[in-house]
Amino acid sequence: MSTLGHQYDNSLVSNAFGFLRLPMNFQPYDSDADWVITGVPFDMATSGRAGGRHGPAAIRQVSTNLAWEHHRFPWSFDMRERLNVVDCGDLVYAFGDAREMSEKLQAHAEKLLSAGKRMLSFGGDHFVTLPLLRAHAKHFGKMALVHFDAHTDTYANGCEFDHGTMFYTAPKEGLIDPHHSVQIGIRTEFDKDNGFTVLDACQVNDRGVDDILAQVKQIVGDMPVYLTFDIDCLDPAFAPGTGTPVIGGLTSDRAIKLVRGLKDLNIVGMDVVEVAPAYDQSEITALAAATLALEMLYIQAAKKGE
């Protein structure tokens, strides 16, 4: 099953260069990479404004503004000297075929994980996390979820492809343990009986960062963790370019501090999703997503250097 653009076309819209100008590698399974970046240009499961399929391209494009800083502030080292990170381009599927996307993404992830790689993925709408969870659970077993979002995405509407149902489906499939999972920044209606710990945006904005992180670590424990960041967790002042913006969200400063504070968790997979550049202003949403993705890589590099 071919999943990457190099099978027939190296000129993918987002792949003139890799994230942070990192090397492009269209054969990541056989590489010596520690982490592999994959774009998933898919937005058929969105319930709001479409356009998330252009998110991976926007994140890569703006990431050139971050590539010059070797020792990213306030870190004391260059992530690229500790982690071997490559960008393998975008998943290729028949646009309009959600099932094919899901199957190919899961197959791609399973192949990478079996080869000893870890994944950082760029959406695309948030549905792409579900096939990624399926692949990661096959490799790591049941996981904890650390989920930044304005929505819990635990809605049971019966639709197979919906970016609001993944975390209703995932516990039922045994992919994640909601009792060891936490959802951060929520500010929309949700079912309080689904087992997840919800730290809504009001308390996240009002409580101290260290206090929140201590609670997250207590909930997650030593389980393998999948980290997913929906950019609409941020307030629209910091991330207007997304499909379902909700006011009252996190600042970019608070989000970065929280992500940095997850360094000690056993994070086995990560994604940043729901960037829709058609609604962005001066690329601030894409820049926020690229910066958060870079911080995710830095927390992995920090652990490797210990």
UniProtKB/Swiss-Prot annotation:
Metal-binding listed as a keyword: yes
GO BP, one annotated term: putrescine biosynthetic process from arginine, via agmatine
Listed cofactors: Mn(2+)
Enzyme Commission number, as recorded: 3.5.3.11
Record keywords, A-Z: Hydrolase, Manganese, Metal-binding, Polyamine biosynthesis, Putrescine biosynthesis, Spermidine biosynthesis
SUPFAM superfamilies recorded: Arginase/deacetylase (SSF52768)
Superkingdom classification of source: Bacteria
Protein name: Agmatinase
Lineage of the species this protein comes from: Bacteria, Pseudomonadati, Pseudomonadota, Gammaproteobacteria, Enterobacterales
